[in-house]
Amino acid sequence: MKRTVVDWNSLFPQVQSRVKRQENLCDSLRAILADQPEAAERILTTARNACEGKVILSGTMGKPFFVGKPPHWHEDMVNDGEFVVELNRMQHWNDCIIAYALTGERVFPELIVSEMADWIKSCPRPAVEGDWDEVRPNFRGPKPWSSLEGGLRMMNAWYNAFCFLMQEDFMTPALFPLFVGSVEDHAEMLMKVPPKLWPEANHNHYLSENVGLFYAGEMLQELPEAKEWQAQAERELERCAKNQLTLDGGQVEGCPLYHNVCIDMFGKWALSAKRCGVEIPSDVLQQIRNAIDYALYSLRPTGEGVPWGDSDPDDQIVQTVGLGYRVFGSREWVDAVCRIIPLEKLKKMSTRYCFSLIGVSFDSFAKAADFRTDELQLPLSNWQHQLQQVMFRTGWDKDALSVFFACRVPCQNGHGHIDPAGFDFCGLGKALLVDPGRYTYREEEMRQTIKSAKMHNTLTIGGREPFTYISSFHFANEKDGCILDLSEGENYTAAQALHTSYFPMIHQRLVAILDRSILLVWDRVDHMTGEEPVEIWYNANTLTAALQSDGTVATHDDVNFCLRASEGLRIDFQPGVISEQVDAVRPSTRIRLTDNASEKGVRNYLSVIVPYQENCPKISAVRFEEDGKTASFSIGQKKYQCNWWDDRFHFDLSCC
């Protein structure tokens, strides 16, 4: 790539003048953290640790770890490849920027300047031309010049550091030429390597790499070649939107965490395009809007994302809706989140995403709006046809009942889990029956355990997994599965799924919310041979589940649920795990319902689950009609009859 001969005496003041005209980064960061002393102290502690060469990375078990002064950029010190790539993303620089904004202490920008100079010196870019079989390995895997890390650096830590150092006059004459040369190295690599790695533009890595390329062009837009960088990036980002965002809005991998990560990147592209005067096509902007809708529907009423697949129950929704407001000026997503998440919690969550939320004041949003139920004109269900996912809830409030239900077989890639027709259920402000999260990407026993069907809210036959776990990101023997239907009627919402993982046996599952207060899980297994037991698994977010004398399972927490299963199922409890962040797990209780019957043909199983706080509802025995297509039960003075005929569901409620 031909590079412009630079007149440093001219270029530096041009660039600095432009960046100083932007909103001052330190002022904005101080505004976000003004009344958040705990968050400020947490960030200051992290930044001071970084000045001592200690950072928290994958494999350090959530504790500061000495990575060197300067860091050993190439070295995997904990036998975890993510350690190297995260170190080379320099996310601790962001904490140092905030720490300076709060304290004015020069030690923080001095660390950024010294580490940037050391990285440029210690990590020369490998050649991007030549035999592809020799070039490719240098930009894949846990290496400083992994193409993914190159893209992430440009749009995140390096862009933030660039703006900060320029605005606060810490970009030194010695560092600036090194910085420009390294950005040019990044741009050349991002133009040439990723298109060969991802020719279909269908992976989140390619999205990261092209947003990074666009940001390289923004940082050095005074250089003639920057327009070429941004033109290629824009062209490829439009392909990314087409190939990575489905028509219904979900990101193709179907993991809410990665979805929000991708929306963060699309949003940052849109913001950079605004600053650079580049217009994004209207159809691409509409796809991004649809994607923000998905993020909202995949939000638990507890204020956390559903940890489906390789996801955590995180708070990225704050970043997503904040970026949505910054890009589109639309408040509907912010209004919905403000109804679900209390203001003080929302402000605390936003401190984790300061750089994405410049100019977003949740304080003013909450004070300016009256969040009455009848004013929020958002549907209560969302069917992602291409992802084979359905999300529905009883309302946009923290006590609503909500279901995330999916049946995507085969999985799109290794970020999926072995959970066909699985679901995640919340009620009364608590996640009750949950997806276990992700824990790690390392090749170890816990990775397989977390991905197992038996750790999800699923059904197994003969104790066998629906398909085979090969390694951390690979499965085998996947068959087919899909969502069949989403239906809504008076007092109910129901969705149906089917998969052939145990062929010739066919598993159908219907999940419904009835009467705004009950979760119904109806499993139907056809072509049973009578040779193997059927197990239904529920991963319960509790340690107090116990079997009552009438056969009901009940919990004894602040927020509880009771479960009554149809007759003929043996109930026992197994230890479970829930992971809410990388490298951390806590115990849960798995409820196992087992049918050891030997009859052949069709079998039906029904679970009635009711959330409650203090007084456990009395659920009667659950009975099927002889044909297995009609089931009935009562709760208190209400009698319920459910019919599931030929893939159609009908529900009747009567009061005694």
What are these regions (language model features)?
Residues 1-56:
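Extreme N-terminal leader/anchor segments
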Residues 79-304, 311-312:
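Aromatic-lined, polymer-binding surfaces characteristic
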